């Protein structure tokens, strides 16, 4: 690629996260230039960044807004979203001082020290879920492990009582549906409304009787007027979305990738010291976010040799950037012993870097490490099966049937 070709609008389907291999599409787009015009649906064309250096630049540039409010052509839709989507009050779309204020309210829960303190509980949950199928010699690692494990950890962190966790898990699933049809828009709104109703009595309980959990800390901040009612609701829903599905996808995608690369599986099984680097490589190779994260231009914005007009949406392609051959040698090869310096971008970068990344890494490290230790002959139940992906905005496995020598 020697220049930017702006004569083509590339189609990036809404179900790109469910495609068996979306990476050739991203590479074809990148061949025309690292910043390209793409079509997300018949009525929405945006800009997409596929280069690593350009993605880092965009993720750290304060001139780009995380909020679509005020963007040309989106005013009507954004006015509706402001009224109906409580996530518009979350730090996900906040900028500047509001983002810092909201992030600081929960940052202590995700420090490395706090995560280290949580590690024994993560290990205990991991062992308990594995114990439930260890003597069978087979399991679906999505429904029996990758999904319930982060839900159990998140429930403890937030302060969800055991009796409420099944409902919590059921409601969380509705948050990941892509809003590409009226029906899914309605389901997403219903899921947010039901989750809001789910949290109301818990919030009342924590206000009356605080515990050592994140929900109590947020209620205390609300009492001090550091967070509004709507922001508190938005925070609980955002934590549910980010803390559950992202980690579940990381675990399932990671195990699937290792089982598809037996030499990498064997290397990691035989040398557990490779685990920290392996998690980073698995995030780079097959992260939970396929299409990317959105930013919005307030003024004309130059990136990668292209001037993007004011009032436009830019999709920063995290998965595409993580396989940029200009940044990574053998970018399409899984190599858990990779020694390259560039940080993978699966958790984003800059001030909006995923707050829960340390916990997600710890959960994945413990989960995958324990699986390999307890089941050294872990394998796909049917190596020739075309396994489907979970429907939603994230890239995750719908099912992952495995076999192994039963314990005991």
Language model region names:
Residues 1-408:
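Cytochrome P450
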């Amino acid at each position: 690629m020697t220049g930017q070709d702006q004569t083509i609008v590339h189609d990036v389907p809404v179900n790109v996260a469910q495609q068996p291999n979306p990476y050739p599409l991203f590479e074809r787009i990148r061949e025309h230039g690292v910043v390209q015009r793409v079509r997300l649906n018949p009525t929405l064309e945006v800009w997409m960044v596929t280069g690593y250096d350009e993605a880092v630049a965009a993720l750290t540039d304060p001139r780009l807004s995380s909020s679509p409010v005020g963007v040309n052509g989106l005013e009507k839709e954004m006015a509706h979203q402001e009224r109906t989507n409580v996530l518009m009050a979350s730090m996900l779309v906040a900028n500047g001082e509001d983002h810092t204020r909201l992030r600081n309210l929960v940052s202590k829960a995700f420090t490395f020290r706090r995560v280290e303190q949580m590690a024994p509980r993560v290990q205990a949950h991991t062992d308990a879920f594995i114990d439930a199928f260890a003597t069978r010699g087979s399991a679906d690692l999505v429904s029996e492990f990758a999904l319930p494990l982060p839900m159990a950890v998140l429930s403890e962190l937030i302060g969800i009582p055991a009796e409420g966790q099944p409902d919590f898990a059921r409601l969380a699933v509705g948050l990941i549906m892509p809003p590409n049809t009226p029906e899914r828009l309605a389901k997403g709104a219903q899921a947010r409304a039901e989750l809001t109703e789910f949290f109301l009595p818990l919030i009342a309980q924590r206000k009356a009787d605080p515990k050592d959990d994140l929900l109590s800390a947020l209620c205390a901040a609300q009492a001090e007027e550091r967070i509004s009612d709507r922001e508190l609701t938005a925070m609980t829903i955002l934590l549910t979305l980010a803390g559950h599905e992202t980690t579940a996808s990381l675990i399932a995608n990671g195990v699937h990738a290792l089982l598809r690369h037996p030499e990498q599986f064997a290397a990691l099984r035989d040398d557990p010291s490779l685990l920290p680097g392996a998690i980073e490589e698995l995030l780079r190779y097959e992260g939970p976010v396929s299409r990317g994260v959105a930013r919005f231009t307030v003024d004309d914005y130059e990136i990668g040799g292209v001037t993007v007009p004011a009032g436009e949406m830019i999709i920063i392609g995290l998965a595409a950037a993580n396989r940029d051959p200009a940044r990574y040698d053998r970018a399409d090869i899984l190599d858990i012993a990779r020694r390259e310096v560039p940080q993978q971008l699966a958790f984003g970068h800059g001030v909006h870097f995923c707050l829960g990344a340390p916990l997600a890494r710890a959960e994945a490290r413990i989960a995958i490490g324990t699986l390999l230790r307890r089941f050294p002959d872990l394998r796909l139940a049917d190596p020739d099966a075309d396994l489907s992906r979970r429907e939603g905005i994230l890239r995750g496995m719908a099912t992952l049937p495995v076999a192994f020598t039963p314990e005991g």
